[in-house]
Regions:
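N-terminal leader/assembly segments
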Residues: 1-67, 201, 206-207
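Short terminal or interdomain "cap/linker" segment that borders an active site or interface and mediates
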Residues: 2-18, 114-147, 154-207
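Amphipathic interaction/junction segments at domain boundaries or subunit interfaces
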Residues: 37, 41-145, 166
Length: 207
């Protein structure tokens, strides 16, 4: 893993510029600015991992005050996928996921996440048809954010009735138990308006 953990500009853009466009209140933008993310200025090429975790925590608290921090982080993970598809790199990557399907999408987990940071490593264990364990080396203090990204990516790849459970989270690494129903024949991305329904069709438990 890299000596200094960095999150790249395109990840910040996917969440805060694209995925949450028009949804950030002034109080949230002010708190983000204080934490090191000024959305009124050009984004930096990369941000420290600890700062990234702070940005996500602030957004979760500000946008989803009636929900737990973990539930809000999950929604931010989905927003990351929604926003990523609006970037040039994201459009290319998510189009590929539709072709690959859910299983091969998971096989590319490290490569997919490394498009947005310099530290992700993963190991995938296939337990049965549409049933996997995905270990990730660093998910920070908000593992449900990564779960939301996995959920959104699998949905993009055509999976339905997605279920994600967390196991063995130690503050850094986490194992995600993932299962889904048969992939849909037409695996287009659910639009932003479908986000709530898509979340309800999935499940996550902290064990």
């Amino acid at each position: 893993m890299a000596d200094e953990l960095l999150v790249f500009e395109q990840t910040i853009e996917a969440v805060f510029v694209r995925g949450l466009h028009g949804r950030l209140p002034a109080t949230c933008k002010a708190r983000l600015r204080q934490a090191g993310l000024d959305l009124d200025q050009k984004l930096r090429p990369a941000y420290p991992f600890d700062a990234w975790m702070a940005f996500l925590r602030i957004a979760s608290e500000e946008l989803y005050p009636e929900q737990t921090l973990e539930q809000g982080a999950w929604k931010l993970g989905e927003a990351c996928i929604d926003g990523f598809q609006e970037t040039m790199l994201g459009r290319a990557m998510l189009s590929l996921l539709r072709v690959l399907g859910p299983r091969r999408t998971l096989l590319r987990a490290t490569q997919n996440f490394r498009a947005g940071n310099n530290y992700t490593e993963s190991r995938l264990k296939e337990l049965g048809p549409r049933n996997f364990e995905l270990w990730m080396n660093e998910v920070g203090s908000l593992p449900t954010f990564t779960a939301g990204i996995i959920f959104g990516g699998l949905r993009t790849a055509g999976a339905t009735s997605i279920r994600i459970e967390m196991d063995g989270y130690d503050g850094h690494a986490c194992t995600y138990r993932i299962s889904w129903s048969e992939a849909s024949v037409s695996s287009g991305v659910a639009g932003k308006g479908d986000s709530r329904a898509a979340t309800r069709s999935g499940s996550i438990n902290s064990l």
